[in-house]
Design a protein with these regions (language model features):
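Short, cysteine/histidine-rich loop/knuckle motifs that typically chelate Zn2+
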Residues: 216-217, 239
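A short, amphipathic alpha-helical segment
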Residues: 184-187, 241-245
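Cysteine-rich micro-motifs
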Residues: 230-244
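Cys/His-rich metal-chelating microdomains
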Residues: 221-224, 243
Length: 247
């Protein structure tokens, strides 16, 4: 399922294909004692089953996992280190993440990052994006991005819960315009804008969800006339554009 700028989200069949691909490769890597494919699997699961933004995934620490704090959720932190929200996850994913820590991050401290680059440093956005793009190509589904996996998570969560406010909380959307973005994603998935969900307190009169976009690197709102789409197809805010030009 794509638009002119690339894939917007995955169909159910495409999601199964991607998850099956990374799981098969990860299981083989575990047998061989290698880590790259296991990291790839963790990345795809955190994007597709938790809906993390790229910067949230890169900043995830071992102390944010259920095995550390005891809640069946991931703690997503803000820029000050405080817990911005708690995203519920399945027991299966919690166990997979715990096994990853036991097998590949043994001895790491709670404040250490969950996922590192292949050189042992912090995992950066472009490295994450390139990994996801490569996985999409190798799984033979074409263009794939962190944003497409996040949108897939949002629409699946809404279809499962039918609770717009809950989806807003889990996805980390705070503004009324962001609520409109969720509505757009969920209604696009249903293929019928006439069936726009109207939950109490979420009236969207006068809000055009197409007036703003979300930076696919940091999650910031991009207003009309700012940001741009880079060569890779990702939409970035002016702040991230300045950062990547310096890098």
């Amino acid at each position: 399922m794509t638009n002119q700028n690339g894939r917007k989200r995955l169909s159910a069949a495409e999601l199964v294909t991607v998850l099956s691909y990374v799981r098969t490769r990860a299981n083989l890597a575990r047998q061989k004692g290698t880590i790259r494919a296991v990291v790839d699997e963790s990345i795809i699961l955190l994007l597709a089953q938790v809906g993390l933004r790229p910067h949230e995934l890169c900043a995830l620490r071992i102390g944010d996992l259920p095995g550390t704090h005891g809640e069946m959720a991931l703690w997503i932190r803000d820029t000050t280190g405080g817990v911005a929200r708690k995203v519920h996850i399945s027991e299966d994913l919690a166990e997979r993440l715990a096994r990853f820590v036991r097998s590949y991050r043994n001895g790491a401290q709670q404040e250490d990052l969950l996922l590192e680059s292949e050189r042992g440093g912090p995992l950066g956005y472009m490295s994450l994006y390139n990994k996801v793009r490569r996985i999409g190509q190798e799984a033979a589904i074409g263009k794939l991005s962190p944003a497409a996996l996040r949108r897939t998570y949002i629409q699946q969560l809404y279809h499962a819960e039918q609770d717009l406010r809950y989806v807003q909380e889990q996805a980390g959307y705070m503004s009324r315009r962001s609520i409109a973005e969720i509505v757009k994603i969920c209604c696009d998935a249903a293929g019928d804008g006439a069936n726009q969900p109207e939950q109490a307190g979420n009236k969207l009169a006068g809000i055009d969800p197409w007036q703003t976009s979300i930076c696919e690197a940091c999650g910031a709102t991009i207003t009309k006339g700012t940001g741009r789409r880079i060569e890779s197809g990702q939409l970035l805010c002016d702040g991230c554009l300045r950062y990547f030009r310096r890098a």
